[in-house]
């Protein structure tokens, strides 16, 4: 399954969520691949060290093959699980190069990403491939959406973010007909008990599952880019990541064994039933 993490704007916690969810599934015995497609503001390299000569940029530029950009970041704690990571080049030169790419190049990249998807799922093969896409509606993020089986849209409670996310889903996502899940991050503690987060948000006739509602936490902010499932097993944020993993499997997954394994990890107080977000047709 290809899962793309996307957001209307930066600063929503999209990257932190993608790398922690990827690590969690690997810890549970899954074969997982995490790819940094935020080519204009890469950040996964701050957590994972590139053990290869090449970057994702090089594959997209037809410099190397797929396996040349994948670094094995598996740990002993993952057992039979596997975590391979493809990192975007963080150098200023590489970022400026990505900024200068034209539409023709981006269209060619879509073909490269589709080949990437086919190869990873059929030849490696992976249970999950996570794309950490650029925020907003630029060609590179649209490519990541088109290649996905499921798109997880991360939003905060900021009004401009919510309205932008709503508009983005209505005007763009429906064109691609992708499965979509919503993660609401950085929710003020005093708002967690409100009906809007516990039940549903009426925005129209279409229903989208809210697979995670994550409270704002100073601990998460000060921890930086931390792999919570490895370093902070009992942290509330870790429990929320497990809840998101459960909901992802419940809604779109195919294996009951994974769900049961997650259930054993999740606190009995956590709600495993996904909520619903509605958005307008027009």
Question: Model-flagged regions — what are they?
Answer:
Residues 7, 36, 87-90, 133, ...:
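Flexible glycine-/small-residue-rich
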Residues 39-121, 222-225, 230:
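P-loop/Walker-type NTP enzyme "switch/lid" segment
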Residues 39, 51-54, 65, 108, ...:
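Charged, alpha-helix-enriched surfaces in structured cytosolic catalytic cores
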Residues 2, 83-85, 210-213:
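Conserved beta-strand scaffold positions in the cores of enzyme catalytic domains, especially
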Residues 174-282:
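C-terminal lobe/tail of nucleotide-utilizing enzymes
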Residues 27, 114-213, 222:
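Conserved catalytic-core segment of NTP-binding enzymes
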Residues 2-68, 127-128:
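Walker A/P-loop NTP-binding active-site region of P-loop NTPases
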